Amino acid sequence: MTQSRTHTCNELRLEHVGQKVKIVGWMENVREVGNNFAFVVVRDFYGTTQVVIEDEAMMAIIKGINKESTISVEGTVRERASKNPKQATGDIEVVPEKIQVLGKCRYNELPFEINRSREADETQRLKYRYLDLRNPAVKQNIILRCNVISALRQAMTEHGFLEITTPILTASSPEGARDYLVPARKHPGKFYALPQAPQQFKQLLMTSGFDRYFQIAPCFRDEDARGDRSPGEFYQLDMEMAFADQEDVFAVLEDVLPPIFAKYGTYNIASSAPFTRIPYREAMEKYGSDKPDLRIDLIVQDMTALVQGVDFAPFAEGNLVKAVVVSDCALTRKNIDKLCADVEVQSGNKPYWFRLDENGELVGGVAKFLAERKEALIEALGLKPGCLVGIAAGKKEAAQKTAGVMRKMLGAAVPGHMDKERYEFCWIVDFPMYEIGEESGELEFCHNPFSMPSGGLEVLLKAERGEIDPLTITADQYDLVCNGVELSSGAVRNHDPEIMIKAFEMVRLGEEDVKKKFPAMYNAFCYGAPPHAGIAPGVDRMVMLLSGEESIREVIPFPMNKNAQDIMMGAPSTVEQKQLDELHIAIVGETEE
């Protein structure tokens, strides 16, 4: 039995008419239209070809084959009497002389129709992912992923970066999300960890004398799933540059990403260099988010002073009150109430609203509380008849978050306020170095503890002496955002042991703590480290944006479900007692069935 083919199922055209050919693939569909007459669709990776059955012998073979069996068809190409312009091979058909089963589908019924698998329950899709991926619409996302990764590799290589792989088994990190731990058989009671990111290794590469590093890095974090985050593992374009600063990192990605987004994206327009830069505090004030979608033309305004003294509890003294003004808003009361309910679900805080009608009166929502402030509101907020004003009130963080969610939803819901068909990048810069911890009530690192503080050692010493508030210290850290999705965080690294120790002392950790938690990196920096900077855009999120998908699972070949389970492979699973004994592990407490 030979499985070689002369052509793929997307290759045959009118110029092949009269030729003897052999095609192979899955039997997608059979349509019987009379005695000993049927149309068969054969599908392979590349496309589909119609096979026409016209004799009893061939019909007998086809009737004995279940759909989704793999077959080979040898026959002659002829021109179709009735052509299908929607199909690449729609001008021809193959008249078979021999049909052979290569791999039998043993089931008469499939879990779902292959070409309609996206309509099936997600659990079924994940359980039978190998069938789901036969759907060309599903497969296309994985092909896109491959093309994007290939383009990223080529672009990074052209920019002088070396692709270097870093260890998968490493030490547990005391920072960030939960680690996936791997017991060390030869070292009872000790564990490796799967890396949450190659952070320390890539910085050590810079200290080792490499100049530009990248890899498509697998990262492992034991964290909950959400629409733009898959549990378990994810991949990122990890990069680091020696003797570099923020501007060097920006220059590389501003050159690499726009052409890839324009070529492979659902939209063929991507912002060009330089990307818009927004300081963190400005982003929170103006957009209510540190990952703003700049395709939306709405901004957040402060109306706290305008409602001071208004007899409405959410506007009470001590609360911030934020407004999102939407011009030419034709949303109905029902639409607005539904949108406000959705905002509350996402933000955890109830929003409010009012409208300026065509007669110049405040109506709807909380308008009755604001009647006496009408003129001041119109002037300060720039209101015109037809404007809807969404309101967020509460403590600073709650008010900003609610306003940000409202801005995003109103921008998408009201026509004319969102240029949807483009990719709009921006950098969020000047993140705070420190914050007051919600639980501890004390100074803590806000984001990455290894970022260089803006101003270096001098600014830390000033804070230590009480000359400045440590909460005003910013870090040389930056986020890359596209269409409201955070693609990556990056930073200029703190490569100086003296500055590093001082930064940690600000949060009540000293030199011994740093040496204990990060021994390799600290010791390496003591041997002369170059200034270096890097970033790591998420590959899965990039492909999700490019494909237009709302769930990141649609762009991963074999994703886990929301509960971090691979229901196709049955992972996680129990293991034999012998394996546990070898690892010196005892299961304590109840186990999941």
What are these regions (language model features)?
Residues 1-593:
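Class II aminoacyl-tRNA synthetase catalytic cores and aaRS-like
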